[in-house]
Amino acid sequence: YAEVPSPAAQAPTAD
């Protein structure tokens, strides 16, 4: 799904 970005990609990588 190119139109909808994955929520994981938007989340900041704290780890």
Swiss-Prot record:
Modified residues (4-hydroxyproline): 5, 7, 12
Glycosylation sites: 5, 7, 12
Keyword entries, A-Z: Glycoprotein, Hydroxylation
PTM section of the record: O-linked glycan consists of a D-galactopyranosyl-backbone, 1-3 or 1-6 linked, substituted with L-arabinofuranosidase probably at the O-3 position.
Protein name in UniProt: Arabinogalactan peptide
